[in-house]
């Protein structure tokens, strides 16, 4: 019921952005005390692309709620568009890549995902930050960093 309400609100334009606080607590931490949040940064885009492949959302809406709108709301003047004068922050998604979320493949320190076992269609293939490739098909370039946007 809650999920349906959120999907309808997203599709009706009542939700401006989708993000993740990415709370990568170890399972042992979650078992000991009440800690809020889940690790989600690695799967949020893939889950949305999977929803696109199921005709539940458009690519344009994903682009807006996961990039463009946040850039506008937070006045990140050089972010959120693929145009001259903007930072070259780009993702390339393989919308036809089928894969299964596995804890062994989680990069986050927590080593688990609430979406473990989900079979998804669509995955990030390349990530470019300021014109530099930082990720390509499972491999990271740890020498490249983005800018601090909080300044």
Residue ranges and their predicted role:
Residues 13-14, 123:
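A short helix-to-beta-strand connector/capping loop
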Residues 87-148:
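C-terminal cap of metal-dependent C-N hydrolases
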Residues 11, 17-96:
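His/Asp/Glu-enriched, well-ordered alpha-helical/loop segment
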Residues 1-7, 73-75:
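Active-site glycine- and acidic-residue-rich loops that bind
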Residues 1-2, 44-47, 118-123:
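Short, surface-exposed, polar/charged, turn-prone segments marking secondary-structure boundaries
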Residues 6-8, 80-81, 117:
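Short, flexible, glycine/charge-rich loop motifs used to bind or transfer phosphoryl groups or to couple energy/partner
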Residues 1-2, 58, 102-103:
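General structural signal for secondary-structure boundaries
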